[in-house]
């Protein structure tokens, strides 16, 4: 991540290109910046919801189980 600003554009580009059917598909700099911001917000929201779920279960540590419980609703919200 670039400081606190989000994911590196190179990483976002690589993630996107892994799922493109045509290897010649290009992504503009603005689109990469937008996707990086989207991913930053998504990960932050997942972390916050994981904390809320852990607190609801009276746990001090967020584990994979809490993230798995909040993921379906998180995906629907995004």
Curated annotation (Swiss-Prot):
InterPro entries: CENP-X
Gene name per UniProt: Cenpx
Protein name, as recorded: Centromere protein X
Induction data: By retinoic acid.
UniProt KW keywords: Acetylation, Cell cycle, Cell division, Centromere, Chromosome, DNA damage, DNA repair, DNA-binding, Kinetochore, Mitosis, Nucleus
Cellular component annotations (GO), alphabetically ordered: FANCM-MHF complex; Fanconi anaemia nuclear complex; inner kinetochore; nucleus
Any single GO BP term: replication fork processing
Pfam families: CENP-X (PF09415)
Native species: Mus musculus
């Amino acid at each position: 991540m670039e400081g606190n600003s989000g994911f590196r554009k190179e990483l976002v580009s690589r993630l996107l290109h892994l799922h493109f059917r045509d290897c010649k598909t290009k992504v503009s700099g603005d689109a990469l910046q937008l996707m990086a911001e989207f991913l930053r917000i998504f990960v932050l929201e997942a972390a916050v919801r994981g904390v809320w779920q852990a607190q609801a279960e009276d746990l001090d540590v967020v584990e994979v189980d809490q993230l798995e419980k909040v993921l379906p609703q998180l995906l629907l919200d995004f």
